[in-house]
Amino acid sequence: MAKGTFERTKPHVNIGTIGHVDHGKTTLTAAITFTAASADPTIETLAYDQIDKAPEEKARGITINTAHVEYQTETRHYSHVDCPGHADYVKNMITGAAQMDGAILVVSSADGPMPQTREHILLARQVGVPYIVVFMNKVDMVDDEELLELVEMEVRELLSKYEFPGDDLPVVKGSALRALEALQSNPKMARGTDKWVDYIWELLDAVDSYIPTPERDTDKTFLMPVEDVFTITGRGTVATGRVERGTVKVQDEVEIVGLTDTRKTTVTGIEMHRKLLDSGMAGDNVGVLLRGVARDDVERGQVLAKPGSIKPHTKFEASVYVLSKDEGGRHSAFFGGYRPQFYFRTTDVTGVVELQEGVEMVMPGDNVTFTVELIKPIAMEEGLRFAIREGGRTVGAGVVSKVLE
């Protein structure tokens, strides 16, 4: 069947399935595509094995296997990610390769929360996944209603422990496999025909109503990482880069943040593809002409931003994935005092790593939290991604989980 073009009239939301291995994340992803397609024939259905053979992709120098599926409900268009292996989740969430506006936490009702359930919730907290909806899968394998209540309580407590609103967030119970089997035998099944399929609809309703539509990048406060700087004789200094978020207009005041002292200036012109514009918005590659700024006052690695919206920092706590030897990472462990380069947006800055108490060393392949002190300040906020490099090769990826100073 040919892929239909998606109507972009609906708001777009990025979500994904998270949870312990074999609890049914991929089966649920397949069941969701079949459920959505039963009401809308333009949606492509994907069977389990089509999702499970996730293609490799690269993000910040790291290879990750991720399956992307698309579907829509009456009110929204969704991009949904599912990863085959636990390590792929860790890498995906830390690099931000697949940004999630919300996640569906899949828990097997027969097993309850398991180690990776906890680990994925912690990761979601550290990398800033803002909303979680729970799907208690495999309820057909549990006869005891009290046992189901117990598992639900455990999951809610675990979420509360990691600062999610465990008491209030939606928990939907069902069986992804039973729903998938029902839909594979009758793809055009109407809602209300089969209870297992209806549980998937209930989950989609919960996702629709509980996970808010994200603010569009263009509506956020302006920020542009500086990639290059040059002088136009008689007109002044131009900083070029891709607008990361927000909008910038001619005559706007902006701050130049990072590496040295923050300074304010005014935008006197904006160019894109050699044409003059009134404004540049998220996603545009632009040249921004800055008033009264010398060529040496602005450099790659700084950002232009709305005044007061972002501050330069040197010390932060990070959640980090360290590449294994097979992934082209280090061959040996590192210890406290390790001094690699931290690549933020467009530049490398040297920093010193301080490990948490009780952690002797970090091995290639580890997922770890530690503190970093940079030798120069970088425009920083929680959720900012970075790569860790040695001599230009990537040895790790991280996300700022807490700004310290």
From Swiss-Prot:
InterPro entries: EF-Tu_GTP-bd (IPR041709), EF-Tu_GTPase (IPR050055), EFTu-like_2 (IPR004161), EFTU_2 (IPR033720), G_TR_CS (IPR031157), P-loop_NTPase (IPR027417), Small_GTP-bd (IPR005225), T_Tr_GTP-bd_dom (IPR000795). PROSITE patterns: G_TR_1 (PS00301), G_TR_2 (PS51722). Its EC number is 3.6.5.3. Mg(2+) binds at residue 26. It is an enzyme of class 3 (hydrolase). Residues 137-140 are annotated as: G4. Its main location: cytoplasm. It is found in: Cytoplasm. GTP binds at residues 19-26, 82-86, 137-140. It holds the Pfam family GTP_EFTU_D2. It catalyses: GTP + H2O = GDP + phosphate + H(+). GO terms for biological process: translational elongation. GO terms for cellular component: cytoplasm. Keywords: Cytoplasm, Elongation factor, GTP-binding, Hydrolase, Magnesium, Metal-binding, Nucleotide-binding, Protein biosynthesis. Residues 82-85 are annotated as: G3. Belongs to the TRAFAC class translation factor GTPase superfamily. Classic translation factor GTPase family. EF-Tu/EF-1A subfamily. Monomer. NCBIfam families: EF-Tu (TIGR00485), PRK00049.1 (NF000766), PRK12735.1 (NF009372), PRK12736.1 (NF009373), small_GTP (TIGR00231). GTP hydrolase that promotes the GTP-dependent binding of aminoacyl-tRNA to the A-site of ribosomes during protein biosynthesis. This is Elongation factor Tu. The lineage of its organism: Bacteria, Thermotogati, Deinococcota, Deinococci, Deinococcales. The gene is tufA.
